[in-house]
């Protein structure tokens, strides 16, 4: 294998020659490119997404999926793979049974994609619980995964919460083969500390009640919040772990109220009840702040919270999520191109700014595409004869990523984690999530305001 070099990729390189019309969310896009860019490349190269597109997650997954497909369409238009045919497949890891993301479906999707020898990488999954099921399959099959949104730290590194009996994640066992997993978003080690700092110093809450949804992401985030919040002198007055199928939280709200909680922290997703907690807080007349992580920051939270007697209950709710890249100069071109490509889509999918991870899906796919292109270039402009060797070479290129895109500058550390970190605090204001400040944790472990 030729030793990969560190290339500097820019958003303009991939966006050249405009945008093609998008296809549906559960679809395949194919185009045969002319013999330019990589002279004489022959064969088919496939990339894919695996994201939750239906059910309770329908307000989340379609955004990074559409963004990733936009990146593929631009690559096809720019003939990024030269004479090779670039093909795109979209997979939905939601099921009717789960009314949203389903780890078993995710694993089945990756198994199916891995069985196709032309598939060189996948953008996804969206949820950490799905990642736990997918990573071992991808590892065994040498297939690159790049998540736009997974934040559970145990997916890539061993931290204290991994051994908690309710989480019990053996990080090493996730990789029976090659380490092929990467993510373009920071982990909950940072998010938990930032959330704790916000609860104590922005919301001025000295007592907090915790609720989590029993999943890898939500439970892990709640435990990290607890660790940092109590270390700062805060008191956890109660903690409840409930399954994602829970539809009423009145008992927990009553407990929090009776214990004098000055805020509630929810570790989990909107699909697993985050907005319903806010709804039930309103019904109980419990008017303290609700704070959640990135799993709560979507339009479904607002509609769920406002579905009770008080139709403005979502107002004033807080959540930390992916940095508000709409304020970055580096993202302006992407959001303009997204709007042009999907102007005919029904709201809210016609506006990429409505979901924080939209741009993350775009950069993740562009990073994958550039890694494949670099692999072809290093092999004389042709796919490697062995599909496994081709996949291994793509993963090797991903490890050397140095990419300037919508998110700014992205590189990966030895664990596959992005070095471009931070989380934005959002607040529901006049019916929409509005970014307040972006925070990061410095090398000394202190929470700082980035913007």
Regions found by a protein language model. Give the residues of each.
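Bacterial N-terminal signal peptides that target proteins for export
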Residues: 1-12
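Beta-alpha junction/loop-to-helix N-cap segments that form part of ligand/metal-binding clefts
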Residues: 4, 29-36, 59-64, 78-169, ...
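C-terminal motif of bacterial Sec signal peptides marking the signal peptidase cleavage site
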Residues: 19-22
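Bacterial signal peptide processing site
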Residues: 24-26
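Extracytoplasmic "Venus flytrap"
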Residues: 35-69, 75, 91-103, 126-127, ...
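Extracytoplasmic ligand/sensor domains, especially the bilobed periplasmic-binding protein
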Residues: 119-240, 289-319
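Extracellular/periplasmic periplasmic-binding protein-like sensory domains
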Residues: 278-362, 374-376
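Segments of small-molecule ligand-sensing domains
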Residues: 343-358, 369-436, 449-450
